[in-house]
Every structure is written in C-alpha cells, then in structure tokens.
Amino acid sequence: MARKRRAPRGAAQGWLTTYSDMVTLMLCFFVMLFNPTEVDITVLQSIAASIVGDPTGGGVSASSGRLADLGNTVNTLPSLEKGQKLATALKKAVSLFAPEIKSNKIAVTSDERGLVISLTSDSFFYPGSSDLNVEESREALLRVAQFLSDHALAGRRFRIEGHTDSVEVPEDGSTDNWELSTRRAVRVLHYLTDFGAQENRFSLAGYADTRAKFSNESPEGRAYNRRVDIVILDEGHF
C-alpha cells in the first residue's frame, strides 16, 4: 500500500508570510503618514499599492474592507496638498496687502476659480479711463508682481479680468464698457510684467458689467463692481 505524501512544511504557512508582509507594509505606511515632516506622496502611493495588491496570488488579501479604499485615499493627498498651498497663499496675500485691504483699495478672496486679488478701479484708474494712476498704484502693483512670482505659486496660471459697473461712461476712447474693461486688464498686465511677472502665465478677459459682485442700484455697489480681478487659477480652470 502506497504511503501518503506529507505536504511540505513551508506550504502550510504561506498565508503567514503574506500576512506578515502586509502588516509590515501597513506599519511603514502609517509611520510615514503621521510623521510631522514633509511626506513624499509618490512613496506613499507605492506603499498603498503594495498593501492593496496581492503579490503572492493567494493567501490573505488586503483588497477587501476598509483597506480596499486605502489607495484611493492616498491618491487624494496631492489635491489636499495643493489646497493647503492655496490656503497658505491666501493667508500671505491678506498679510501682504493689509494696508490696501484696510483702505478698500484691494480685496483678497477665494472662490471656485481660485485665489482672487481684486483691485478697486477707483483707486487704480482715472474715472472712465484705462490709464493707471501710477502714483497711487505703483507700489501695490509691484507687490502683486512679487507675490505672483513667489516659488509657492510655481506652476500656477493667472487670469486678469476687467469689470465695470452698469453706468460707467468710457472717457479714454473706448467704444463701450467691454473695451474699457479689457483695456484696464491689459494695462495691469503690462505693469505686472514690467515688474517681473512672467507674461506667458497670464490670460486676459474683459467682462464689462456682466459679472457684478454687488447691486448696481447704489453708488457703493457700483464702486465695488468697478474692479480688476487678478485670479490665481485653480487647476480645474487652467
């Protein structure tokens, strides 16, 4: 009678090796995740991929339950990092332009487009004109150019948007408020690039009175609507 062959000793413990590898990878991942120093996103993604995958083709798999979403969670970290950079830029802009914000010459906000630096036209331009009041605006525009050139905004693109109110009458030869708003955006661009901002990172738009932020029924609302927005674009609006 033939004797039964005994299974190799190592085969019965194959699941233990797989489980041990998974635990080790998880430990490395969470140590790096909660390390207070800067985290390399690429490394985290590689670790997550190793955890979620099943390198042995058998045994215990981490591809089910909460661990199944681990790779997706890590993939969201670059977006989170970019959001944090934009929040940091917003805080820096508020501090940098504090005097102009206090005097209502500049407003710093954020919306679905990205970070927005709004120049009040009455403080930067002559009434009905695309000519800049250089004496009043030069120092502020220099700081705007320096801010846009900061390494923290590397890779970002900018859009300069001109806006008017519903009653402003062009006095600089512009045929209408569409042309006036566009000319003002162009004029701001020229000053920013003269002060060192990179021209190839900009785009321009003139919206006349079609993008009002406040009601045009009051003088105060119209004054705030007369503006030039410098938008640090979120990636989805490139």
Swiss-Prot record:
Gene3D superfamilies: OmpA-like domain
Transmembrane segments: 15-34
Lineage: superkingdom: Bacteria
SUPFAM superfamilies: OmpA-like
Keywords: Cell inner membrane, Cell membrane, Chemotaxis, Flagellar rotation, Membrane, Transmembrane, Transmembrane helix
Main location: membrane
Cytoplasmic topological domain: 1-14
Gene Ontology biological process terms, A to Z: archaeal or bacterial-type flagellum-dependent cell motility; chemotaxis
Listed Pfam families: MotB_plug, OmpA
The OmpA-like domain, residue ranges: 112-236
Subcellular localization, as worded in the UniProt entry: Cell inner membrane
Function: MotA and MotB comprise the stator element of the flagellar motor complex. Required for the rotation of the flagellar motor. Might be a linker that fastens the torque-generating machinery to the cell wall.
UniProt name for this protein: Motility protein B
Taxonomic source organism: Treponema pallidum (strain Nichols)
